[in-house]
Amino acid sequence: MCPTVEPLVAEEVAVQIVLNSKFFRTLSVGDLAAKARALGFDGLDIIVRPGHPVNPDNVATALPAAVALWKKEGLVCPLATTPVTLVDPAAPEVEPLYAGCAAAGVPRVKIGFFPFKAGDDYWGLVEAARRTLAGFARVGERYGVQTVYQVHSGPVLGSNCAGLMHLLRGLDPRWVGAYPDLGHMVLDGEDYPMGLAMVRDSLSIVAVKDAYHAPQPAGSEPPFVPRFVKLGSGAVNWRRALGALKALGYDGAFSVHTEYDFDESIIRQVGYADATPPHLEEWAQADAAFLRRMWRES
């Protein structure tokens, strides 16, 4: 009788699921740690913007102190997210930001977006944006910190993975990385395996949200508009998206953006951090659990 042979099971790839802190601006860094843990997250994508506990005025010292505190709590901080208007590597706040990240051990910085207006010279804007990103790369190389650019639907460069690679192709991925957003991809993007294959060599971190095109009252133009919802309630095909990431060997972080019940008028305003979504903590906790389950099952 032949001995029973157990089938080989692939070892599960551990990933970090972190909470984007933009809707938690009133919390101290200590309270942010407690909140992230309570909601089931592994750490924080820390917002570095005016009015937040870590901000452009104090980032050089506040960020290292915050990350040291979070580390004691077993939490990670894989990303610092800046104002959506920060697109100049020579801006005075850039050096303290990158210095603070280097001192804190935060490996990457998300900068702002390059806007597009009807009538603009697209390829001229792309070339200008690439020069800007090369400038951020030089700053990042000095400090050992990568700059990432996020996919964001709407009138900005890099509104899908193809557009993002217009900006990134040929730049050193050690210092300029791709930050695909699974929710924005379902609105303006490509099929997940194809889009993620485009950014594979520059893939750094992944943004998580869900969205769909919601019907509007009869006679509205257009009759459907984008709306963000909790994970699993929108059009994102999670098994396909996460399966595509697994197929690429992705083992990095997911930043959960906790954007819920926002409609077209808000979504297309890039960086709308002043609006607080309903059911924030309840749905954020559900998002973390949903994403872990989908990652295991994909």
Can you say where each PLM-predicted feature lies in the sequence?
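Short catalytic-loop micro-motif centered on adjacent basic/acidic residues
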Residues: 18-21, 79-81, 148-150, 179-181
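Residue-level detector of anion-binding/catalytic polar loops
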Residues: 42-43, 76, 107, 146, ...
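Glycine-rich, proline-tolerant flexible connector loops at the mouths of alpha/beta enzymes
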Residues: 45-67, 116-121
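Conserved beta-strand positions in the central sheet of alpha/beta enzyme cores
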Residues: 45, 79, 110, 148, ...
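Active-site-proximal loop/turn and secondary-structure-junction residues that shape catalytic pockets
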Residues: 23-25, 48-50, 83-86, 113-117, ...
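Active-site acidic/histidine proton-transfer and metal-coordination neighborhood
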Residues: 3, 30-33, 69-73, 86-178, ...
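Histidine-acidic metal/acid-base catalytic patches
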Residues: 8-21, 25-40, 105, 161-176, ...
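N-terminal export leaders
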Residues: 1-2, 7
